[in-house]
Regions:
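Conserved alpha-helical elements of the SDR catalytic core
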Residues: 41, 48, 68
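N-terminal leader/signal peptides at the extreme start of proteins
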Residues: 1-24
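Aliphatic-rich helix starts adjacent to a transmembrane/signal segment
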Residues: 44-61
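Periplasmic/extracellular, small/polar-rich flexible segments of pilin-like filament-forming proteins
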Residues: 72-152
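Internal alpha-helical transmembrane segments of multi-pass membrane proteins, especially GPCRs
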Residues: 26-29, 50
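N-terminal alpha-helical signal peptides/signal-anchor transmembrane segments
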Residues: 57-76
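Alpha-helical hydrophobic helix detector
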Residues: 28-44
Length: 152
């Protein structure tokens, strides 16, 4: 049985109260550390989401590149023979939450994909080049390069 002494509570009761729970200072320190970590993590996560959304534009553009490459194999060296969706035998791509527009430039055959604001408003271009030996290559361009969303 525990009895109160004249100076207050007995030593056993003091020990019980001394070791229980976290202090307010410890809890504030943990909350501050979580806040600091979140301040660095949230902007990085937003950039990651934007890059992921922009990849939809890149995928649509590459799908048109495959169709254009097949068309150019049949048409020979004439890029202008493969510069519309009708000549590529494919429907025009639909817009989405991430893709504002996808198009093929007349006569030059440059494929351009434009992202929406959710994906950064960047552009991605693929320019077909047929060299003197008849080899087809594509040059990557657009505002996505300077933003680090795509590689040249």
């Amino acid at each position: 049985m525990l009895y109160a002494t004249q100076s207050g509570l007995s030593s056993e009761i003091k020990k019980i109260y001394r070791v229980s729970g976290f202090s307010l200072l410890e809890l504030l320190l943990v909350v501050a550390l979580i806040g600091i970590l979140a301040a660095f993590a949230v902007p990085s996560y937003q950039t990651y989401l934007q890059k992921t959304r922009f990849m939809e534009v890149v995928q649509h553009t590459h799908a048109i590149r495959v169709a254009q490459s097949a068309c150019l194999l049949q048409a020979g060296d004439s890029v202008s023979a493969c510069d519309t969706f009708g000549e590529l035998a494919m429907p025009e791509p639909l817009t989405s939450d991430n893709t504002q527009s996808i198009g093929v430039s007349a006569t030059s055959g440059i494929i351009t994909g434009t992202a929406t604001a959710a994906a950064g408003n960047y552009t991605f271009t693929l320019s077909p080049i047929i060299n003197s030996r008849g080899l087809l290559t594509y040059t990557v361009g657009g505002s996505c390069i300077s933003a680090g969303f795509c590689k040249p």
